[in-house]
Regions:
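Active-site loop-to-helix "anion-binding N-cap" substructures in soluble metabolic enzymes
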Residues: 66, 93-117, 126-128, 142, ...
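Alpha-helix-loop-beta-strand connector modules within alpha/beta enzyme cores
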Residues: 102-118, 166-177, 339
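Metal-associated gating/positioning segment near the N- to mid-region
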Residues: 50-115
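Histidine/acidic residue-rich metal-binding segments in metalloenzymes
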Residues: 132-311
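His/Asp/Glu-enriched, well-ordered alpha-helical/loop segment
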Residues: 199-220, 224-229, 283, 304-305, ...
């Protein structure tokens, strides 16, 4: 890979926006400053005042491999990710087979090697009967342990109280949870099926997967974490109700200590609400459900106010045909990695928070939370995972979607910013119009 110098950039990093230059030597950031001069053999990239960010780290994706490659795979979805400025991803364990032991975990890493355009990590999964495997997790091998405390794909719903207690007691890595109470959901679903049959209106989804189901399950997770002093990260907060359960303040406190219990929300909870079901139907059916406009507003404020610590995508593609089945057969999940950062930048344009705050939630915080080694920041010596943002509007078109499923819930949406360039490990991966070069993603290292 060629060394290069980015000049005339507006660097966004660690709470600051400042004019400067950034040098990349090999796969690393070698210098950050002002007035840097090009060396022999260096390519000069003129940022022309555009914002230069560290690459985003998405701590929640479902790239569907192995077992569901007809709708997505590591190669296709990592391509969409780098086109969207996401340079690292952490993939969920509810594949087929699920990632419930070390052999399945290492199989995923082997699949990604040489095929992933973004850097990659894979979660270990918990089930009702793999506590011994959980106890043997290598903390350097995975970002964390995913516990589905709500309905999931495959044998991954953990609803045995003794097993849950043992998992929270014995895990050697952070626990990340999907919190919805399955019995509550099943009871409400039965009522709606009695009324509508299989073709339940999409706008009923947030009533079926209710805020009460979220709250009950989240309270259980918090109680177990406090009982065992477990490092807990609650995923995809979707309700205003849950926000009061979490500590307000920075992930890393002024004294250097960190929150033990953290929470994340996702881009679709910032950009959609109940009113959008009429237009988009099952395209925005996801678990937990997109809820009311008041929830959307409260979640946006909570992200700005440091109640929520991380922004992610929960990218979960399904085919267009699957999404147009009747409600009970239409799967939950939507493709998001390609347009997540540009969608989040709309919150910046709207004044909800600044670019530096967005970078904190979508790059710095995931790196800190999961102890990702030398990524997530613009720092000398760190890997050169970079994103150049251009404030030129564009409209999402289906023909530009890179995810294998071939559609986006943002089709027809005009965003005020676009991704001009993405670099992964010092190599250009996206030039603003097309993918560039070979897959350069590497296995994420966890500095534990």
């Amino acid at each position: 890979m060629a060394d290069f110098l980015i000049v005339n950039a507006r660097l966004v990093n660690e709470g600051r926006e400042f004019e400067g230059d950034l040098r990349v030597t090999g796969d690393r950031i070698s210098a950050i400053g002002s007035g840097l001069s090009a060396r022999n053999g260096e390519t000069v990239v003129d940022a022309a005042g555009r914002r230069l960010l560290p690459g985003m780290i998405d701590d929640q994706v479902h790239f569907r491999e192995p077992g569901m490659e007809y709708k997505a795979d590591i190669a296709s979805e990592s391509a969409a990710a780098v086109a969207g400025g996401l340079t690292s991803f952490m993939d969920m364990p509810n594949t087929s087979p699920p990632t419930l032991n070390n052999a399945a975990l290492e199989d995923k890493y082997a699949r990604a090697a040489g095929r992933a355009r973004a850097n990659y990590g894979f979660y270990f999964g918990a089930s009702n009967d793999n506590l011994a495997d959980v106890q043997g997790i290598d903390p350097k091998a995975t970002p964390g342990l995913k516990v589905f405390m709500g309905a999931s794909t495959g044998n991954m719903l953990v609803d045995n109280p003794e097993t849950l207690d043992g998992i929270f007691r014995d895990t050697p890595v952070p626990i990340i949870t999907h919190c919805e109470d399955t019995p509550m959901i099943d009871a409400i679903l039965a009522q709606y099926r009695a009324k509508y049959g299989d073709d339940i209106p999409a706008e009923c989804h947030p009533d079926i997967r209710s805020r009460e189901a979220c709250m009950k399950s989240t309270l259980l997770a918090l109680s177990l974490a406090r009982k065992h002093d477990t490092r807990l990260h609650v995923l995809h907060i979707s309700t205003a109700d849950e926000l009061a359960l979490f500590e307000r303040g920075p992930l890393v406190r002024p004294d250097g200590s960190r929150k033990r219990i953290t929470a994340e929300t996702c881009i679709h909870f910032l950009r959609f609400d109940r009113a959008d079901y009429a237009r988009l139907g099952h395209q925005i059916k996801c678990n937990p459900a997109i809820k009311d406009a008041a929830d959307r507003a409260a979640i946006t404020r909570a992200l700005a106010d440091d109640v929520l610590d991380v922004l992610a995508t929960d990218h979960a593609p399904h085919t267009w045909e699957e999404k147009h089945n009747p409600y009970v057969r239409a799967p939950s999940g939507l493709p998001l990695v390609q347009y997540a950062l540009t969608a989040a930048l709309e919150c910046v344009h709207e004044g909800s928070f600044g670019t530096a705050h967005l970078v904190q939630k979508f790059a710095h915080a995931p790196a800190q939370l999961f102890d990702v080694k030398e990524r997530g920041f613009l720092r000398e010596g760190y890997f050169a995972d970079l994103v150049l943002v251009d404030d030129t509007p564009f409209t999402v078109r289906r023909e530009d979607v890179l995810s294998k499923c071939g559609w986006s819930p943002f089709e027809g949406t005009t965003f005020r910013s676009r991704i001009a360039s993405t670099w992964v490990n010092g190599a250009l991966a996206w030039d603003g119009k097309a993918l560039v070069g070979d897959a350069r993603g590497r296995r994420l290292e966890f500095d534990r």
